[in-house]
Amino acid sequence: GQTNPVDDGPVSFAALLRLVSATPGLMRLRFTTSNPKDLSDDLMRCFAELENLCPQFHLPVQSGSDRILSLMNRKYTVAEYLQKVEALRTYRPDIALTTDMIIGFPGETDEDFEATMQLLETVRFHGSFSFKYSDRPGTRAAFFDNPVDEQVKSQRLSRFQKRQDEISLERNAEYMDRVL
């Protein structure tokens, strides 16, 4: 599961990436995602070291509010997330970052949502997968008794996605007249 630690065993994932990267004739190497709490400096350093590692990374944040992240049991804060973003961009300045965002988690206030919008402005993701919260049976959140009104969730999601689309368009324009 997403909130369970990864046991890399005797070989770390970063070491495995380095081994795979050295495969003769391998022009492009991509891995998709990591939970921010499990993203090591060694793994981030691979983006600087491995020429064939694609400069794109999906780093799901879920919310820009520490309070909501705690309710989600995410095990990291917005500040810790931003440190990962800064490190990735230091190691690979041209890295394209994408994320996941859940809008309308139970108890999400206007202030929590505005914190999410602020994170969007700060990071300026190249893209995001964003959705309205919906109950999942068997999760702690399914038992929370303070749901966000569906109309409010829809309005917030629309606002978030509209701004993300604008940022994505600006980000995509940066690739004009470039060979990638």
Model regions: which residues?
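Short capping/connector residues at structural and topological boundaries
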Residues: H58, N73-T77, G138, D149, ...
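Terminal RNA-binding accessory module
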Residues: A142-L180
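C-terminal, non-catalytic macromolecule-binding modules
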Residues: Y91, E111, A115-L157
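Hydrophobic alpha-helical packing residues
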Residues: V20, V85-L88, L120, F160-Q164
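Conserved SAM/AdoMet-binding glycine-rich loop
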Residues: G1-D110
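Short acidic (Asp/Glu) and glycine-rich catalytic loops that position anionic groups and cofactors
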Residues: D66, L97, D135-R140, Q161
